[in-house]
Design a protein with these regions (language model features):
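Small-molecule-sensing regulatory modules
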Residues: 60-67, 95, 104-105, 113-116, ...
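Acidic/His-rich segments in extracytoplasmic proteins that coordinate ligands and/or metal ions
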Residues: 1-41, 112-153
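Histidine- and/or cysteine-centered catalytic micro-motif in compact active-site loops
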Residues: 79-80, 106-107, 123, 131-132
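His/Asp/Glu-enriched short active-site or ligand-binding loop at hydrolase and phosphoryl-transfer sites
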Residues: 87-110, 130
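Extracytoplasmic metal-acquisition and chelation regions
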Residues: 9-46, 82-96, 155-184
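Structural recognition of the beta-strand scaffold that forms the well-ordered cores
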Residues: 20-22, 73-76, 101-104, 126-129, ...
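Residue-level preference for short coil/turn positions at secondary-structure junctions
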Residues: 16, 68-70, 121-122, 158
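Basic- and aromatic-lined ligand-binding clefts that recognize polyanionic substrates
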Residues: 47-97, 170
Length: 185
């Protein structure tokens, strides 16, 4: 409401104020709802509904495809300083991709974690995909961790199960690419 009032004041009374659509998704269901809400605001409801159906079917098919696979524990590192785990929709993405997220909970902000937390979880897989970073920048962030003795003793590191992800392009933005993100996992 404050933002809408400020925009009306800024534009003056002689112009039609824009329609504001506030988005703050925390789960995949929220992302789907936001797609629907945007499609209504943009007067392309059928297109929005088709996209939601396509994504929902894709997630359902992916879950079916990985259902017989061994599930691995996955630590998705959303940030490196401070260390942060997966929040918002990321635990759902990891689950659809066949993993069980550690140190994160769907529908909640990404938690700050300590090395002791990561050691206690000792994940099978670590995905480094800091929010807003491409692969090259994520690789740079990873270098700051690899000299740490705590890092070297993790099962995922010892087993070569550490992956660098394009958080900016795939994981951190709430939209249609989240299906592709789950497929990548």
């Amino acid at each position: 409401d404050e933002v809408e009032t400020a925009i009306k004041d800024w534009m003056g009374s002689h112009r039609v104020p824009p329609k504001l659509v506030s988005l703050e998704p925390m789960t995949l269901d929220d992302v789907m709802t936001d797609i629907r809400n945007l499609s209504v605001a943009l007067k392309c409801e059928a297109r929005g509904e088709a996209l939601v159906k396509e994504m929902s079917l894709g997630f359902k098919n992916l879950a079916k495809a990985v259902s017989g696979e061994e599930r691995k524990s996955v630590f998705f590192m959303e940030w490196t300083a401070p260390l942060m785990g997966a929040g918002n929709w990321m635990p759902e993405i990891i689950s659809y991709g066949g993993g069980d997220v550690v140190l994160g909970e769907s529908g909640h902000h990404s938690p700050t974690v300590a090395w002791d937390d990561i050691h206690a979880a000792n994940p099978d897989v670590i995905i480094v995909g800091p929010c807003g970073f491409d692969v090259e920048r994520a690789r740079e962030e990873l270098r700051s961790l690899t000299d740490n003795s705590s890092w070297q003793s993790l099962r995922a590191v010892q087993d070569g199960e550490v992956y660098i992800a394009n958080g900016n392009h795939f994981y951190n933005r709430p939209g249609p690419r989240l299906l592709e993100s789950a497929i990548i996992v």
